[in-house]
UniProtKB/Swiss-Prot annotation:
Homooligomer. Both monomeric and oligomeric forms interact with RNA. Interacts with protein M. Interacts with NSP3; this interaction serves to tether the genome to the newly translated replicase-transcriptase complex at a very early stage of infection. The modification Phosphoserine is found at S190, S192, S379. The gene is N. It comes from Avian infectious bronchitis virus (strain Beaudette) (IBV). The modification Phosphothreonine is found at T378. Keywords: ADP-ribosylation, Disulfide bond, Host Golgi apparatus, Phosphoprotein, Ribonucleoprotein, RNA-binding, Transcription, Transcription regulation, Viral nucleoprotein, Virion. Residues 31-156 form the CoV N NTD domain. The lineage of its organism: Viruses, Riboviria, Orthornavirae, Pisuviricota, Pisoniviricetes. It is found in: Virion; Host endoplasmic reticulum-Golgi intermediate compartment; Host Golgi apparatus. This is Nucleoprotein.
Length: 409
């Protein structure tokens, strides 16, 4: 093993050098730490580990007869609000006759102790291997030639050929040793992918819990990353992120209301249910590459089909009518509401709830004025006026349960 200094006399993971380096001392040192890195439970209250093979870590410096020892449970905690909180236990390996349980013989029963032995080991003998002084020696990386612990445990992967070049690299090396490895290790269990998925799911859950806490810097980054990867942050307008709305070309979706409200507009959430995923866009589109003076232009043509019997078919049609080439328009039900009068004001003739007396209408004069106004209208204006006058669809859209798919968004 190679010498080097590491901060603290603890069993915290540290970078490890080759197993084939200088042999560890034959007697105990001033420290009382395990020679090996720990295995860590994935959950709280996990039962003691079981091993596919002998459970003794690989170490070519140890004689076969001394390949026996015990795994000892170490409770762990992390600081939190209201005091420290428990985290899943760590288990450290010690050779028989060394470590915190040095007074026990192999096989003696004690809580938090699991005895292991390799084939051909003399379990009646006691090891002269001693324990590790963290100030002088690094941890061995764990390797199990005949099978490691069961799927309830994991350990941080440390490459065998990683060395230390002094104290200045200790922190970065330790951080790297604690990071998930993309490489496999001999004895690593096949369910490590499940562990990765579980950790990824926890990260997503944590992000969802903190989803409303988007900092100003994060929002700015969301709005100004590469154009094809942008998303609209809260309180941003559509044109702040994707530019002005247009007609008949790219950027033609969104009316004035949607442009102003951004993701607060419920129609955005509804339509995102029809937008293809990245994989669907790449593999389900007609992709057309074209070299231009400013670079490579990629065009993706994708069609989403909403069946006619879809419960929200009419709502999707309505949104498309409103938002495709919708710049300069607003939904018909997006009319300014009259301000409510304060109930604390005394009733007067001006604000009395009693209906005002209506004057008789002068039918002939009004009709004449209407006829003159109609003559000044274009055909498009007449059509718009007709929609405004006779538009009687409900102002509140009931999306129902089928507005979004069960697994969408």
């Amino acid at each position: 093993m190679a010498s080097g200094k590491a901060a603290g006399k603890t069993d915290a993971p540290a970078p490890v050098i080759k197993l084939g380096g200088p042999k560890p001392p034959k007697v105990g040192s001033s420290g009382n730490a395990s020679w090996f890195q720990a295995i860590k439970a994935k959950k709280l209250n996990t039962p003691p580990p079981k091993f596919e093979g002998s459970g003794v870590p690989d170490n070519e410096n140890i004689k076969p007869s001394q390949q026996h020892g015990y795994w000892r449970r170490q409770a762990r905690f992390k600081p939190g609000k209201g005091g420290r909180k428990p985290v899943p236990d760590a288990w450290y390996f010690y050779y028989t006759g060394t470590g915190p349980a040095a007074d026990l013989n192999w096989g003696d029963t004690q809580d938090g102790i699991v005895w292991v032995a390799a084939k051909g080991a003399d379990t009646k003998s006691r090891s002269n291997q001693g324990t590790r002084d963290p100030d002088k020696f690094d941890q061995y990386p764990l390797r199990f030639s005949d099978g490691g612990p069961d799927g309830n445990f994991r350990w941080d992967f440390i490459p065998l050929n990683r060395g230390r070049s002094g104290r200045s690299t200790a922190a970065s090396s330790a951080a790297a040793s604690r990071a998930p490895s993309r490489e496999g290790s001999r004895g690593r269990r096949s369910d490590s992918g499940d562990d990765l998925i579980a950790r990824a799911a926890k990260i997503i859950q944590d992000q969802q819990k903190k989803g409303s806490r988007i900092t100003k810097a994060k929002a700015d980054e969301m709005a100004h990353r590469r154009y094809c990867k942008r998303t609209i942050p809260p309180n941003y307008r559509v044109d702040q992120v994707f530019g002005p709305r247009t007609k008949g070309k790219e950027g033609n979706f969104g009316d004035d209301k949607m442009n102003e409200e951004g993701i607060k507009d419920g129609r955005v959430t509804a339509m995102l249910n029809l937008v293809p995923s990245s994989h669907a866009c790449l593999f389900g589109s007609r992709v057309t590459p074209k070299l231009q003076l400013d670079g490579l232009h990629l065009r993706f043509e994708f069609t989403t089909v909403v069946p006619c019997d879809d419960p929200q078919f009419d709502n999707y049609v309505k949104i498309c009518d409103q938002c495709v080439d919708g710049v300069g328009t607003r939904p018909k039900d997006d009319e300014p509401k009259p301000k409510s009068r304060s109930s604390s004001r005394p009733a007067t003739r001006g604000n009395s709830p009693a209906p005002r007396q209506q004057r008789p209408k002068k039918e002939k004069k009004l009709k004449k004025q209407d006829d003159e106004a109609d003559k000044a209208l274009t055909s498009d204006e007449e059509r718009n006026n007709a929609q405004l006058e006779f538009y009687d669809e409900p102002k509140v859209i009931n999306w129902g349960d089928a507005a979004l798919g069960e697994n969408e968004l």
